């Protein structure tokens, strides 16, 4: 254990030594800096990533959602109307029509109220480390001091 401790102390001293036969840099070489100027030109082709937000995708998605809602409501009306009709229609086996019943949830207009929450005294301790990890760190430090 003592050998490892000494090796850890001596290694930076050995590695940080300067040797006489090394090539030294001149002051002019040390401060010589090359400047490179470049410009970034964006490439607009079909395969590159476009970082602009295209809102038309969102608008078309909203339109599709609206149309889907309109179709489901009209299908529901047709389903209820056809269930009350007295005559039967022939089914076309090549073009089956499937209808889904539409269920709607009642909309409440009551305001949502939340109760004021009082701060808990244990909230301050939740940001600290758990006592197990603190105890483990303390035992490791005590063990390290004991072996030195």
Curated annotation (Swiss-Prot):
A Pfam match: DUF4634
Protein's name according to its UniProt entry: Uncharacterized protein C1orf54 homolog
Any GO BP annotation: response to wounding
Cellular location(s): Secreted
Region (Disordered): 91-125
Leader peptide range in chain numbering: 1-16
Cellular component GO terms, alphabetical: extracellular region
InterPro entries given in the database record: DUF4634
Keywords: Glycoprotein, Secreted, Signal
Biased composition (Low complexity): 96-116
Organism from which the protein derives: Mus musculus
The organism's place on the tree of life at top rank: Eukaryota
Positions glycosylated per UniProt: 50
